[in-house]
Amino acid sequence: MTKQTSRLFFGIAAMAFMAILVSANHNDNIITTENGMTVVNTTELTRDIKGFKGSTPVKIFIKKNKVVKVEALPNRETPKFFDKVKPLLKHWDGKTVKKALDSEPDVITGATYSSDAIMKNVQVGLEYYNDHK
């Protein structure tokens, strides 16, 4: 192997290694622990799931395989319409992860895009929890 080929090989290997480190670090914030609960943050998982004005990430708090609560994270939805969706966040409280995944709450009239996005965020977050707990 020539010196130039060797440098090229090691340069590519170093870039691949850095990409792996960055991607591993990138997902470290999806599942965390707060106050003895497992918390799934859907910000990175659901960038493509949009409400009316953009993404609507949530934090899902889980303890002993039960959903304790779902919190909306900062988003760009119109506050007037997003306020209609807030009661939906309680739909999963107290349910086991399996029951929460199987449940299908009704879309909120007048905030269809936002409520649909919240439901999809919770679904993706709970599936991620099941796959990575």
What is the meaning of each model-derived region?
Residues 3-11, 19-116, 120-133:
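Flexible, solvent-exposed loop/hinge segments and secondary-structure transition points
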